[in-house]
């Protein structure tokens, strides 16, 4: 591949930096200690989204087993409902979302995450939510509902908000 072709598609250009390593280490520390998650904050256009997407497949539990981590992002919408949050998460997990109620979407999400958590001995799964600063307080409570449902199912879930 010529240098011109490499530069033509810069989207695949990636330089792992010490900051990305520290970010991965911090997220894994949360996962391995069983933390419910954390908030990752940084200035705009620093590369948080790219870094998060790159490390998704590298996350592991304290036994070194892979943890399924799911990513979604939010933007400003005219509808700031809990159902909108659940619909966005369900789409990110592969669901075809129609006119389901918030309760049906929540049920689908928790069952999907619970299934994914069975892949490791710690029954653990992670959600990474990008552009979290755009969510209202009411919408943020939707994540507490997901977390609580998973706890009832004996599933360990860590939710990371990137803002």
Identify the role of each PLM range.
Residues 54-55, 141-144:
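Short, glycine/charged-enriched secondary-structure capping and boundary segments
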Residues 5-9, 19-26, 78-142, 150-162:
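Mid-core helix/loop region of P-loop NTP-binding domains shared across ATPases and GTPases
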Residues 62-76:
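Conserved catalytic segments around the Walker B and adjacent sensor/switch elements
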Residues 37-39, 69, 124-126:
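Residue-level preference for the first positions of well-ordered beta-strands
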Residues 46, 73-77, 133:
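Short histidine/acidic/glycine/proline-rich micro-motifs that form metal-
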Residues 1-41:
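Walker A/P-loop-proximal flanking segment of P-loop NTPase domains
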Residues 33-57:
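Walker A/P-loop nucleotide-binding motif
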Residues 59, 63, 147-150:
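Active-site catalytic pocket residues across diverse enzymes, especially alpha/beta-hydrolases
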